[in-house]
Amino acid sequence: MLLRTASSFSLLKANADHILPLPNSSSSGIIRYSQSLGKNLVPCATKDTNNRPLTGVVFEPFEEVKKELDLVPTVPQASLARQKYTDDCEATINEQINVEYNVSYVYHAMFAYFDRDNVALKGLAKFFKESSEEEREHAEKLMEYQNKRGGKVKLQSIVMPLSEFDHEEKGDALYAMELALSLEKLTNEKLLNLHSVASKNNDVQLADFIESEFLGEQVEAIKKISEYVAQLRRVGKGHGVWHFDQMLLHEEGVAA
């Protein structure tokens, strides 16, 4: 769309219709003046006789898109959606997917332990099962984002977790919860590293994704499990563990 100069104002003359260009102006406006009203000039609107377009086109889509068309891959194996997505960011996301799956696997092992008939701490079993599912959802969310940006998901091996969580001094509940707190802090470090990689590669979209989907939630999880650890340290290994377990059993949304 072309912009044209607005119509200029002019001054009327009653008995004569002299037309002069605007003084000290490069515009094409005119001045009409009159003496019928004394020496005062009466301003009025008049149409410019020379409607010249302004220069400076903001956006020329068909010209600018030419360079983008050259970037669209023609090889069948190449992603069509990929744009400003570095190999470094792609690899780090695959590493984070592996972290989330490994943590999920450990939590699932904890769920299986506390669900045993000779342990029977159903609240802790519920907590770690929900935590395992949440970490798996995190991994899947990262996989979806990887595909969205045109990267390739490469799943890596998962380490076999422990099957026994009883501790001679701390007991099983406190030991497992302290382990969970360590895992959440480790996951947070990995997420911060992923955010750092995104920033170094000027990938604002990846940085925003990590900030909005993971970092805030991770802080909340660390706070919640820290409180659980503090409470279990107070109750020791005795009857208080059962009361703590009942609290988790009847609490909604207890997963980290």
Swiss-Prot record:
GO cellular component terms given for this protein: chloroplast; cytoplasm
Positions annotated to bind Fe cation 2: E135, E184, Q218
Spans annotated as Extension peptide (EP): 50-82
Any one biological process term the GO annotation gives: iron ion transport
Catalytic activity: 4 Fe(2+) + O2 + 4 H(+) = 4 Fe(3+) + 2 H2O
This protein's record includes keyword Isomerase: no
Residues bound to Fe cation 1: E100, E135, H138
Transit peptide, residue positions per record: 1-49
Keyword Chloroplast included in the entry's annotation: yes
Gene3D superfamilies: 1.20.1260.10
GO molecular function: ferric iron binding; ferrous iron binding; ferroxidase activity
Subcellular localization, as worded in the UniProt entry: Plastid, Chloroplast
Residue span(s) of domain Ferritin-like diiron: 83-236
Keywords tagged on the record: Chloroplast, Iron, Iron storage, Metal-binding, Oxidoreductase, Plastid, Transit peptide
EC numbers: 1.16.3.1
InterPro entries: Ferritin, Ferritin-like, Ferritin-like_diiron, Ferritin-like_SF, Ferritin_CS, Ferritin_DPS_dom
Quaternary structure and interacting proteins, as annotated: Oligomer of 24 subunits. There are two types of subunits: L (light) chain and H (heavy) chain. The major chain can be light or heavy, depending on the species and tissue type. The functional molecule forms a roughly spherical shell with a diameter of 12 nm and contains a central cavity into which the insoluble mineral iron core is deposited.
Protein family per UniProt: Belongs to the ferritin family.
Function of the protein: Stores iron in a soluble, non-toxic, readily available form. Important for iron homeostasis. Has ferroxidase activity. Iron is taken up in the ferrous form and deposited as ferric hydroxides after oxidation.
Name of this protein: Ferritin-3, chloroplastic
Species this chain originates from: Glycine max
